[in-house]
Swiss-Prot record:
Gene3D superfamilies xrefs: Ribosomal protein L9, C-terminal domain, Ribosomal protein L9, N-terminal domain
Protein name: Large ribosomal subunit protein bL9
Cellular component annotations (GO), alphabetically ordered: ribonucleoprotein complex; ribosome
Function in brief: Binds to the 23S rRNA.
Keywords: Ribonucleoprotein, Ribosomal protein, RNA-binding, rRNA-binding
One Pfam family in the UniProt entry: Ribosomal_L9_N
Stated family: Belongs to the bacterial ribosomal protein bL9 family.
Entry-linked PROSITE patterns: RIBOSOMAL_L9
UniProt keyword Ribosomal protein, yes or no: yes
Gene Ontology annotations of biological process type: translation
SUPFAM superfamilies assigned: L9 N-domain-like (SSF55658), Ribosomal protein L9 C-domain (SSF55653)
Gene Ontology molecular function, alphabetical: rRNA binding; structural constituent of ribosome
């Protein structure tokens, strides 16, 4: 299916690109999330008329993400979990736990934006985590997991 991208999509293209994707990807993900439209002649003409407005919105989203990223960059987040004497946690710290802790500190972060390169955290100590605020803005956050004695 031919679609017009209404915003930048990772590994697919930028705003205004006409790309070919699988029908299911377009119908079930891109179009419902308002990231794309079918590339009909009328849709292309309408898009060209609204192009400046959409580019302005994309620039505002990027600026907001960069401002949030400057506040988040280099942040050390402290979480405490029950742990055994060997430093292993009972359970784990997931991206959901980290997102909740960041929201409690006043940041607008969803769990899908928290990237954990080594999977859930299962040990006590410092762990690097990447928070992807925008397709172009990713910041590093250090999570300090402290163990509570059982």
């Amino acid at each position: 299916m031919q679609i017009i991208l209404l915003e930048k999509v990772v590994n697919l293209g930028n705003l205004g690109d006409v790309v070919r994707v699988k029908d299911g990807y377009a119908r079930n993900f891109l179009i419902p999330n308002k990231q794309a439209r079918r590339a009909t002649d009328s849709a292309i003409k309408e898009f060209e008329a609204r192009r400046a407005e959409l580019e302005k919105l994309a620039a505002e989203k990027l600026a907001a993400a960069q401002a949030e990223g400057e506040k988040l960059n280099g942040l050390t987040l402290q979480l405490s979990q029950k742990a055994g004497v060997d430093g292993r946690l009972f359970g784990s710290v997931t991206n959901h736990d980290i997102a909740d802790a960041l929201v409690a500190q006043g940041f607008k972060v969803e769990k899908a934006q928290v990237r954990m390169p080594n999977g859930p955290l299962k040990t006590v100590g410092d762990h690097p985590v990447v928070v992807s605020l925008h397709t172009d803005v990713a910041v590093d956050v250090t999570v300090l997991v402290q163990g509570d004695a059982v």
